[in-house]
Amino acid sequence: SPTVIALRVVEALSPR
């Protein structure tokens, strides 16, 4: 399921 991977990508691109 690429859904979890997509979530990780968005999470990584999100500036903390």
UniProtKB/Swiss-Prot annotation:
Superkingdom as given in the UniProt entry: Eukaryota
Miscellaneous: On the 2D-gel the determined pI of this protein is: 7.4, its MW is: 83.1 kDa.
Name this polypeptide is given: Putative cytochrome c oxidase subunit II PS17
Organism: Pinus strobus (Eastern white pine)
